[in-house]
Swiss-Prot record:
Tree of life domain: Bacteria
Any GO CC annotation of this UniProt entry: cytosol
One Pfam family hit: DUF520
Protein name: Nucleotide-binding protein Noc_2254
Family assignment from sequence similarity: Belongs to the YajQ family.
Organism field: Nitrosococcus oceani (strain ATCC 19707 / BCRC 17464 / JCM 30415 / NCIMB 11848 / C-107)
Length: 160
């Protein structure tokens, strides 16, 4: 029986490379000269540090551009409100990975409403789709691409 998995993952190496590129560009740009603007990365979070909110916005634009060039979907980033304290501005950006239970339920609901002859099961932070025909699975992929989910999805382990 053909199956595939629906996941939401971020390539950590590409993310780190994009952050390094942004930090390098910030060091050479004229509008950031003499400031201590940089991006710090922890496990699942990016922290943008600058001297003003305008510089944070510029850093976010540069980050989005570099991520897009490296093939990382920008929708996986969830920005929080910037904190401005004196001459320091910080913004925390959460890197979302994995499909949470609510989104997995939405995916299963969308599949069931389509009345395709496939089964969907939640397996941790991914959803496994199985069906008798490969065409049905391809229709499910097309259906999920058109669905309005606020999370970038990847389709892996397509097996016959």
């Amino acid at each position: 029986m053909p199956t595939f998995d629906v996941v939401s993952e971020v390539d950590k190496h590409e993310l780190q490379n994009a952050i390094d590129q942004v930090n390098r560009e910030i060091g050479t740009r004229f509008d950031f000269r003499g400031t201590e603007a940089h991006i710090e990365k922890s496990e699942e979070e990016l922290i943008l540090v600058a001297e003003s909110e305008f510089q944070l916005q510029q850093m976010r634009t540069i980050l989005d551009t570099k991520l897009a060039k490296r093939g990382v979907d920008v929708d996986c980033l969830e920005a929080k409100e910037p904190e401005i304290i004196g001459k320091r501005a910080r913004q925390s950006i959460q890197v979302r990975q994995g499909i949470d239970k609510d989104t997995a339920r939405k995916i299963i609901k969308i599949i069931k409403e389509s009345k395709l002859k496939v089964q969907a099961a939640i397996q941790g932070e991914q959803v496994r789709i199985s069906g008798k025909k490969r065409d049905d699975l391809q229709q499910v992929i097309a259906l999920l691409r058109e669905a309005d989910l606020d999370l970038p999805l990847q389709y892996i382990n397509f097996r016959d």
